[in-house]
Amino acid sequence: MNIVQANTISPAIRKLISFATSDKKVEQEYEKYILLSNRTLYSVEFEGEIAGCIGIEQISLSECEIKHIAVLAVQRGKGIGSKMINFIASKYPSIVAETDYEAVDFYRRYGFFITSLGEKYPGVERFLCQYNKQ
């Protein structure tokens, strides 16, 4: 895992963040990782190429919120997402994330406790995912 600190966003990181937020918000979200001391963006490589990224916001010394997590479509199913969660869980015993229906099973398989937040946006059910290391 590598901390992403470049002042300009690379095409690979731009693409990954766009999977987790709208295209219009990519630059704004990336800037938060550069400017805010409680936010960190990590990338992971597979076969020499950036294959995924995970961005967190530190809530306390023992808790963080996953703000973005994404893996390139061609690299999915290879354990890259789990590797990123393992890395974050090694640093923070308590992790929270908010996600949609498409990603909720990923968190559930990892051992997150899932709570429906209902329709936060018209037609879009959101879920709160909470993980506490035993």
Residue ranges and their predicted role:
Residues 1-28, 45:
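Short amphipathic alpha-helix that is part of the acyltransferase structural core
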Residues 32-43, 65:
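A short helix-loop-beta-strand connector motif used in the catalytic cores of GNAT acetyltransferases and
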Residues 43, 49-58, 62-70:
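Conserved beta-strand in the GNAT
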Residues 45-47, 131-133:
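Active-site beta-strand termini and strand-to-loop segments that position acidic
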Residues 75-87:
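Conserved acetyl-CoA pyrophosphate-binding loop and the N-cap/start of the following alpha-helix
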Residues 82, 101-125:
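Conserved active-site alpha-helix within GNAT-family acetyltransferase domains
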Residues 90-102:
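Conserved GNAT acetyl-CoA-binding A-motif
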